[in-house]
Swiss-Prot record:
GO terms for molecular function: GTP binding; GTPase activity; metal ion binding. The gene is mnmE. The lineage of its organism: Bacteria, Bacillati, Bacillota, Clostridia, Thermoanaerobacterales. GO terms for biological process: tRNA methylation; tRNA wobble uridine modification. Belongs to the TRAFAC class TrmE-Era-EngA-EngB-Septin-like GTPase superfamily. TrmE GTPase family. Keywords: Cytoplasm, GTP-binding, Hydrolase, Magnesium, Metal-binding, Nucleotide-binding, Potassium, tRNA processing. Mg(2+) binds at residues 236, 257. It is found in: Cytoplasm. This is tRNA modification GTPase MnmE. Exhibits a very high intrinsic GTPase hydrolysis rate. Involved in the addition of a carboxymethylaminomethyl (cmnm) group at the wobble position (U34) of certain tRNAs, forming tRNA-cmnm(5)s(2)U34. It comes from Thermoanaerobacter sp. (strain X514).
Length: 460
């Protein structure tokens, strides 16, 4: 596939030790030869591939030296895009990188669109679409666990699973076409039984991948963890303690937190999206009332609730009312302020929590915080909240395609069991193949491909 030559700054556009201007395309070597003066004069177009060269970037018109650089030369096909790639490693900073990019564009390159380097890797067949999406996940990973899953996808774990299912479906199509061309009653009955078994296996395989979509959301977006409780029990103090910084305002005045505060914290590799909410209580104060409404909305979407109770006060009607709206949720009861004289009634507490998990903490003395983090981690990995360290995770786009593929495969199973003709069965199988192809890109539309790569930053 032939494209023009593109260029972009691939590093952060600000003050930094090093900046990189990347080129990709058939004219990359020609362009760099016009603006790069290597040490010990040599023809940069004839050097060995995958080598690094010291020299200066010089404006060919004015002879002005722009910067002292190292230039990487990588010839196709063994490159990121499977095209000739040149990377100019210059000093960081907006001025130098921008001037070098400007010079490169003046020599005939085009400014790359967001994600265009990775898009070319896909269009040139080096990676499939699921691997391209893994690049975004690696860039956006909030923890090493998220990075680990993204790396598995990048090397083709998702694509290989999809290929296995597609190969099985292709095998079924071959069998069915043989039955259409060479119908023999005894053989046909045996073949249809085998086809039915394989079709059911494929449905099970699809189900396993669909089940991992919730895990994928947690890994990519973080475990949505709402800190809930009545006013002044120490919700904001708990947020600050877990973040190990003062992010939320803490006072003795009930109702201080009026809005939702969201922050990420890394708990043993799991990205936790902590959501500090306004204290839930009946109030006539308009702003606080809006905050309480928002808190209740957060509850509906939360994966985990940290229900904060005050150990230095007796349980109140407000505590019970809050518990009533938490039905069906994963809850950890956080008994805060244990550094103060305990006034909470143990029997009432047991009645309220119904043998739930209770962690005693003091956000002031930093007591119990590690136990709380361990409890969250164990909840996730023992299966109370869906996530397994050894599984392959998928995103919402993959899930939609898999659900559609499953629908067609179930229709295929029904058709075989109902004795329908081979021609009708092949329609469902081909439709399932089409859906699976959307995941890896073979049958993805141009609009879908463009939409995916528009999520990338320029230079990647």
């Amino acid at each position: 596939m032939v494209f023009d030559t593109i260029a972009a700054i691939s590093t952060f556009p600000g003050e930094a030790g090093i900046g990189i201007v990347r080129l990709s395309g058939d004219d990359a070597l020609e362009i760099i030869s016009k603006i790069f003066k290597p040490y010990k004069s040599k023809d940069i177009k004839k050097v060995k591939s995958h080598t690094l060269h010291y020299g200066h970037i010089v404006d060919p018109e004015t002879e002005e030296v722009y910067d002292e650089v190292l230039v990487s030369i990588m010839e196709k096909p063994n490159t990121y895009t499977r095209e000739d790639i040149v990377e100019i490693n210059c000093h960081g900073g907006i001025v130098v990188t921008s001037k070098i990019l400007e010079l490169v564009l003046k020599q005939g390159a085009r400014l790359a669109e967001p994600g265009e380097f990775t898009k070319r890797a896909f269009l040139n067949g080096r990676i499939d679409l699921s691997q391209a999406e893994a690049v975004i996940d690696i860039i956006r990973a909030k923890t090493m666990l998220a990075n680990r899953y993204a790396q598995k996808q990048l090397v083709g774990y998702v694509g290989s699973k999809i290929k296995e299912m597609k190969d099985k479906i292709m095998g079924l199509l071959v069998h069915l076409l043989a039955l259409i061309d060479f119908p023999e009653e005894d053989v046909e009955e045996l073949e249809r039984k085998e086809i039915l078994e394989t079709a059911k296996e494929i449905v099970e395989d699809i189900d396993k991948l669909i089940a991992s979509s919730e895990s994928g959301r947690i890994i990519r977006e973080g475990l949505k963890t709402a800190i809930i409780g009545k006013p002044n029990v120490g919700k904001s103090s708990l947020l600050n303690a877990l973040l190990k910084e003062n992010r939320a305002i803490v006072t003795d005045i009930p109702g201080t937190t009026r809005d939702i505060i969201e922050e990420y914290v890394n708990v043993k590799g799991i990205p936790i999206k902590l959501i500090d909410t306004a204290g839930i209580r009946d109030t006539d104060e308009l702003v606080e009332k809006i905050g309480v409404t928002k808190s209740k909305e957060v509850l509906a979407e939360a994966d985990l609730i940290l229900f904060v109770l005050d150990a230095s006060r007796e349980l109140t009607k407000e505590d019970y009312e809050i518990f009533d709206i938490l039905t069906g949720k994963n809850i950890i009861f956080v008994l805060n302020k244990i550094d103060l004289p305990k006034k909470i009634d143990e029997k009432e507490l047991k009645d309220l929590t119904k043998d739930g998990i209770i962690i005693e903490v003091s956000t002031v003395e930093k007591i119990g915080l590690e136990e709380l983090e361990n409890t969250i981690y164990n909840l996730v990995f023992r299966g109370d909240i869906s996530l397994r360290e050894d599984e392959i995770v998928i995103n919402s786009r993959h899930k939609e395609a898999l659900i559609n593929a499953k629908k067609y495969m179930e229709s295929c199973v029904e058709a075989i069991e109902g004795g329908y003709s081979e021609d009708l069965i092949t329609i469902d199988l081909n439709a399932a193949l089409d859906q699976l192809g959307k995941i890896t890109g073979e049958t993805a539309t141009e609009d879908l491909i463009n939409e995916i790569f528009e999520r990338f930053c320029v230079g990647k």
